[in-house]
UniProtKB/Swiss-Prot annotation:
Active site: 133 (for autocatalytic cleavage activity), 171 (for autocatalytic cleavage activity)
Family membership noted in the UniProt record: Belongs to the peptidase S24 family.
Self-association and partners: Homodimer.
Upper taxonomic lineage: Bacteria, Bacillati, Bacillota, Bacilli, Lactobacillales
Catalytic activity: Hydrolysis of Ala-|-Gly bond in repressor LexA
Assigned keywords, A-Z: Autocatalytic cleavage, DNA damage, DNA repair, DNA replication, DNA-binding, Hydrolase, Repressor, SOS response, Transcription, Transcription regulation
Swiss-Prot/TrEMBL site (Cleavage) positions: 96-97
Pfam families, A to Z: LexA_DNA_bind, Peptidase_S24
Its biological purpose: Represses a number of genes involved in the response to DNA damage (SOS response), including recA and lexA. In the presence of single-stranded DNA, RecA interacts with LexA causing an autocatalytic cleavage which disrupts the DNA-binding part of LexA, leading to derepression of the SOS regulon and eventually DNA repair.
Name listed for the protein in its UniProt record: LexA repressor
GO molecular function, one term: DNA binding
DNA-binding region: 29-49
Amino acid sequence: MAITQESKQIQVLRFIHEAQSENGYPPTVREIGEAVGLSSSSTIHGHIERLVKKGYLLKDASKPRARAIEVTDIGLEMLGISTTPGKIPVLGMVTAGTPILAVEEEATEFFPIPDNLMQFDGDLFMLNVHGDSMVNIGILDGDKVIVRKQENADNGDVVVAMNDNNEATVKRFFREADHYRLQPENNSMAPIILQKVSILGKVIGLYRDAIY
């Protein structure tokens, strides 16, 4: 019985961590119950209190909802999640201009993951930007973009996309009636129209070595 009880507590802990990573705030008691198969709110509260006592959760009702319950480093270790800061591999160059063959398979260097992106550890890569087609949104020649790996994109997302010739570019993505439009953020540049496109990832961050 003790093993079953511990297992259910870990399920609660894991769901709290996953929901908070995905949404930016912890789940409700009802959501926890639905996820782990518990209908009694008092039972769920009991699991949470025991997780707090074990040091796996930190609960502070005085904080905003986003930080009212947090999984501690000890709790993350219990879930098998490393608390050592991860690194983002830099995989070459991407153009903010005419597409070029750019993305390499092996990292040329590594950057520490910012705290606000730690939940995406393992799903991130960086590319050096060459060109000025995205200047309207502040992506400049020489910047590094942080990209979350994903194969799909919503209209308006800034993505790293690859055409049939394995040429990569960073542009704003639009799926239209019979083609895909990769839109520059530079008023002097025309969009790229493609019949087929592969999405390598969505741009979610930016790093700049120096401010001029």
